[in-house]
């Protein structure tokens, strides 16, 4: 029979059978980790709709990543999603061996027309990060903000820069302490790093990694979340969070596959606020506690971002302390 398998990639024509696309996720960290959790949640939602049939592997080492890709491709998966920041070259080499399999991978690099089945994405949620920075700039009393990140790679750097820019628009005298822990998932190390920043005068923390909000809670200061909303776990600590919605990214890829139009592309734009890829989490327990001037500016900038009259600068360079 004519299967969805042979007609998903560009040039093969549309598929008419609405069969779920056999999809595999490959993650180097647990699916509970905040960044990967957004991909996982979107994939589960797509499976619930009947668009995909989803399986996944977590805690896959970078050295093992290519082998797992090959296993899923050999098993008949036609869409493979994940993050290849630590296995960029190896992942592309394997993808080239399976031209009838579509790859949608988190990557620090752009798409390559020579590898038409390999699309890339990243969490370009700088818009939400900017808005959360405005709130942080209004809430700090010491004018000293601590920022703990995983690695200084573009997808982290741009969010930190956007947060800093938002804070500085609200309060141009703010100083920042910036540090990277060299891990995507090491809550104890993130917590230890945050404690040092608090000792050095920070009274609000940018929690790019798990563990930072724990330090803020223990020392009774505030934190700003990233990618997911953890206020339910830290109701008196996390003021606001820039949320990443992976659904627009994945749904676009699924639609392209269903139409037989999937090709190498940069899906990062579907993380922009105007595409529905990011938002500021509800203030919840901090509703009414953020200065009105800050909230007025947040609403103005949000409207400006959505209309295109204000653009948050994307700066992928490593940020430093001030």
Cite the ranges covered by each PLM segment.
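Hinge/cleft segment of the Venus flytrap/periplasmic-binding protein
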Residues: 259-322
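N-terminal export leaders
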Residues: 1-2
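Extracytoplasmic "Venus flytrap"
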Residues: 21-49, 55-65, 85, 152-158
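Short beta-strand elements in bilobed, periplasmic/extracellular small-molecule ligand-binding domains
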Residues: 49-59, 171-184
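Periplasmic-binding protein-like
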Residues: 77-84, 104-106, 200-210, 226
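Short beta-strand elements at the ligand-binding edges of bilobed clamshell
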Residues: 112-135, 147-152, 235-248
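Flexible loop/hinge segments that line or gate small-molecule binding clefts
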Residues: 96-122, 227-236
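An alpha-beta-alpha
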Residues: 43, 129-173, 178, 266-288
């Amino acid at each position: 029979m004519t299967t969805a398998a042979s007609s998903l990639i560009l040039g093969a024509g549309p598929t008419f059978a609405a069969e779920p696309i056999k999809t595999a996720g490959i993650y180097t960290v647990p699916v509970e980790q905040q960044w990967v959790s957004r991909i996982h949640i979107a994939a589960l939602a797509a499976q619930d709709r009947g668009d995909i049939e989803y399986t996944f592997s977590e805690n896959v080492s970078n050295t093992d990543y290519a082998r797992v890709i090959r296993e899923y491709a050999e098993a008949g998966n036609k869409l493979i999603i994940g993050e290849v920041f630590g296995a960029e070259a190896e992942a592309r080499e394997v993808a080239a061996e399976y031209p009838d399999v579509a790859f949608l991978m988190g990557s620090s690099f752009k798409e390559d027309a020579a590898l038409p089945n390999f699309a890339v994405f990243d969490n370009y949620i700088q818009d939400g990060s900017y808005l959360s920075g405005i709130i942080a700039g209004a809430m700090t009393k010491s004018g000293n903000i601590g920022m703990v990140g995983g690695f200084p790679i573009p997808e982290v750097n741009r969010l930190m820069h956007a947060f800093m820019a938002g804070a500085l628009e609200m309060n141009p005298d703010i100083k920042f302490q910036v540090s990277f822990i060299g891990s995507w998932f090491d809550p104890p190390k993130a917590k230890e790093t945050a404690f040092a920043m608090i000792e050095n005068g920070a009274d609000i923390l940018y929690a790019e990694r798990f563990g930072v909000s724990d330090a803020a809670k223990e020392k009774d200061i505030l934190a700003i979340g990233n990618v997911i909303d953890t206020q339910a776990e830290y109701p008196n600590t996390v003021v606001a969070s820039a949320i990443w919605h992976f659904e627009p990214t994945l749904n676009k890829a699924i639609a392209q596959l269903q139409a037989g139009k999937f090709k190498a592309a940069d899906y990062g734009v579907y993380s922009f606020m105007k595409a529905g890829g990011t938002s500021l989490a509800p203030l919840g327990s901090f509703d009414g506690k953020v200065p009105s001037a800050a909230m007025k500016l947040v609403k103005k900038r949000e409207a400006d971002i959505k209309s295109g009259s204000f653009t948050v600068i994307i700066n992928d360079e490593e940020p430093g302390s001030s």
